[in-house]
Swiss-Prot record:
Gene Ontology cellular-component annotations: neuronal cell body membrane; plasma membrane
Subcellular location: Cell membrane
Extracellular side: 1-35, 86-107, 177-223, 329-343
GO biological process, one term: G protein-coupled receptor signaling pathway
InterPro entries: 7TM_GPCR_serpentine_rcpt_Srw, GPCR_1, GPCR_Rhodpsn, GPCR_Rhodpsn_7TM
Transmembrane residue ranges: 36-56, 65-85, 108-128, 156-176, 224-244, 308-328, 344-364
Stretches with biased composition (Polar residues): 487-499
Region described as Disordered: spans on this chain: 452-510
Similarity comment: Belongs to the G-protein coupled receptor 1 family.
Major subcellular location class: membrane
Name of this protein: G-protein coupled receptor dmsr-1
Glycosylation sites: N186
Length: 510
């Protein structure tokens, strides 16, 4: 395709330089393996992004951020699959077997469609990463502020639709750039059968409308592709990375200040319920369960933001060199395109492929919820049951803390709950238990639903009933939302048949 007549030169480069020889050496070293590596990354990335789409669209995973990540995975899948067909055909078929059917009009149409589709999908993915950083910034800024903006699923759907639509509209000048030219096959292939010497070959070229008016359409599409699709999103990504890092620092400082203040609170709390005095002390209050503690919530915020920062950083690292090269290619003389851009084009293409493949690795390494959902979707139920049967395996989302509960029953003779010899009476119940972040289920149906095991795929180590006394019904006037642990506390009253050993056995069965 002819670019010289539509080129604008601001910087003139020398005709010869030792750097040109270095770039040529890099090209000669990497180009023979580029096609194989590209196909491998395309196949791997297509499978990985398909897994991302399946997992992130599950009902339990539908959040505004995950919906944007799903749209990014869809765009990356389109880019990788289109690039897979292009690389396979033109690297291993068209140039190797110079037959007219491999250079037909249909393949020329595919080449133009591949150029447009890859540009729109890849640019949409880049701008969606900017939208992702913006959504996370707004979410963190409005956290704890009742009057702040709350990002919902509907907002994420609108953001995805608007982003993709605007990218497609801005790419409209690029749609007018190309036409299909017919030329002899011997001008395309060097190793050609003499019988196909004058056979037609169809290739894309610059359209006449793009060259009209001093190449107005071509220049417009070129600068839109370089500035709007490369440089501008990279600048915004850099800004949001800085803002998110600043928010992380503020959150960390606030959490440390709150934890420091919480250390001055009394460690033991005593409450009264139904004539009983309950004393509860929590060990290790500085690091409680991940689902309910202050530090756990802060760590979840940090992990989510760090994961999104990793995604944005990968996008920034892979896109910034391409943006710089695209701008310089439009500003420098023809020597830049011949000796630098063309020789480094394969490496820039490799950066794009790596950026499209890294999301799955980031999710699996930094998101426990994604790993659990991926394990539940793609791992068979029998394997899950065998995994849960191991006593040393605990769900990573379970809260874990050591809680000491002491049941002190007032004594009619002396109100201190002790006998005359200074020891507690026989009716005094004291138990030290380990609370795991699950509540006692009233029947085995809840356990079956939680573990995914049923009569077809049973989990033998999981008990289907508990040997201790049944839980008492909720009395009238009590809060229906009272958890099962509260009923266990009530079972230590005078009319209860449960003993301290029964309570211990109850929690041991959990």
């Amino acid at each position: 395709m002819e670019f010289t007549e539509c080129k604008t030169t601001f910087i003139h480069l020398p005709d010869k330089s030792f750097l040109y020889d270095v770039f040529v050496s890099v090209y000669n070293f990497y180009h023979p393996i580029h096609a194989y590596l590209s196909i491998f990354l395309c196949v791997l990335g297509t499978i990985a992004n398909f897994c991302n789409i399946v997992v992130l669209t599950r009902r339990t995973m539908r959040t505004p951020v995950n919906m944007i990540l799903t749209a990014m995975a869809s765009c990356d899948t389109v880019v990788l699959f289109s690039n897979l067909i292009y690389t396979t055909h033109y690297s291993f078929v068209a140039f190797k077997f110079c037959h007219p059917k491999h250079w037909s009009y249909s393949w020329a149409l595919f080449l133009i469609a591949h150029a447009h589709l890859s540009l729109v999908a890849h640019s949409s993915s880049v701008w969606l990463s900017v939208m992702l950083a913006l959504v996370r910034y707004v979410t963190l800024r409005s956290r704890g502020n009742m009057g702040g903006m709350q990002v919902t699923l509907r907002h994420s759907y609108y953001a995805v639709a608007v982003t993709v639509s605007l990218v497609a509209v801005l790419n409209a000048p690029n749609f007018l750039n190309y036409k299909i030219n017919e030329q002899p096959l011997n001008e395309t292939c060097t190793d050609l059968d003499p019988m196909f010497w004058n056979s037609p070959a169809y290739l894309p070229g610059i359209a006449d409308i793009a060259k009209a008016n001093s190449c107005l359409v071509f220049r417009l599409s070129y600068w839109i592709s370089g500035m709007v699709f490369k440089v501008l999103p990279c600048a915004l990504l850099s800004l949001f990375v800085w803002l998110l890092l600043r928010i992380l620092r503020e959150v960390r400082e606030n959490r440390q200040r709150l934890l420091k203040n919480s250390q001055h609170r009394p460690p033991n709390q005593t409450t009264t319920r139904n004539g009983q005095r309950l004393s509860i002390s929590v060990a290790g209050n500085e690091k409680l369960g991940r689902n309910g503690s202050l530090r756990g919530r802060g760590e979840r915020v940090d992990r989510t933001t760090h994961m999104l920062l990793a995604i944005v950083a990968v996008m920034l690292v892979t896109e910034l060199p391409q943006g710089i090269m695209a701008v310089l290619s439009g500003m420098c003389s023809e020597e830049f395109r011949i000796y630098i851009y063309n020789n480094l084009g394969d490496i820039l293409d490799l950066f794009s492929l790596c950026g499209s493949c890294c999301s799955f690795i980031i999710y699996c390494s930094m998101s426990g919820q994604f790993r659990n959902e991926f394990h539940r979707v793609f791992v068979p139920a029998k394997v899950r049951c065998l995994r849960m049967s191991s006593p040393s395996i605990r769900r990573p989302s379970d809260a874990y803390s050591t809680t000491k509960m002491t049941f002190l029953k007032p004594n009619e003779k002396n109100g201190n709950g002790m006998n005359g010899n200074g020891t507690y009476s026989e009716d005094t119940r004291s138990a030290s238990v380990k609370m795991v972040g699950i509540q006692v289920r009233r029947n085995s149906t809840e356990i079956t639903r939680m573990t995914g095991c049923d009569s077809i795929t049973p989990c033998s180590p999981m008990p289907t009933s508990f040997p201790s006394s049944p839980l008492p019904p909720i009395r009238s006037g009590e809060d229906e939302s009272t958890d099962e642990t509260s009923h266990l506390l009530n079972s230590s009253g005078p009319n209860s048949t449960a003993s301290a050993d029964g309570i211990r056995g109850h929690f041991q069965n959990i």
